[in-house]
Amino acid sequence: VAALALSVGALSLIASLPKSDPNVLVLAHVTAKSTVKAPAKIPAIAKSRPVQLTIAKIGVNTEVGTLGLQPDHQIMVPDNTHTVGWYKDGPTPGEIGSAVILGHVDSTLGPGIFFYLKSLQAGDRVKLVLADGTITNFVVSKVVQYSKSNFPDRLVYGSHGTRSLQLVTCGGAFDHATGHYESNIVVFSHLVSVSIPKSEVRS
């Protein structure tokens, strides 16, 4: 199984790496034609863990587990290559900040749940159902490949003052000596709508 080697530093916004950086490959980004404007006002939601992830474009419809930190401060990874995990020390998808969901690209047995993640394009939709029944809808803004040796922890996990969701998996070249991929694929997306059960609507 190709593990996701990610660490978390201080959770605050930093500038993204320069476009000319050889460790960064932009696979997709928002253009004038692909830009999707968010509604002027999206209602606040209560904290509730995500339980179901759907990405229709790549055929993903799976349960969401929870992930924490290992003793060495590396992010845990899902035990099953066909499920995903939400980093539970971050915000609920739809709250202010960066919610992060991780999944495997493949294993020795074949493709994993995020095998086609890198094929997403700006404007594609991502839906998450929360435990309280709230549905949060996100739109992809860009897809970037980062070298693991220069992974921008704070950019991916930090609070940007917006309601964002990052999807992370492995990618790039595979190092047969270590048994791991050399890069990570990160899909950046932003909240565009929520559907809150009547019992949960705040007055």
Kindly give the residue locations of the regions a language model identified.
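Solvent-exposed, non-transmembrane regions of membrane-associated and secreted proteins
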Residues: 7-203
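N-terminal Sec-pathway targeting helices
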Residues: 1-3
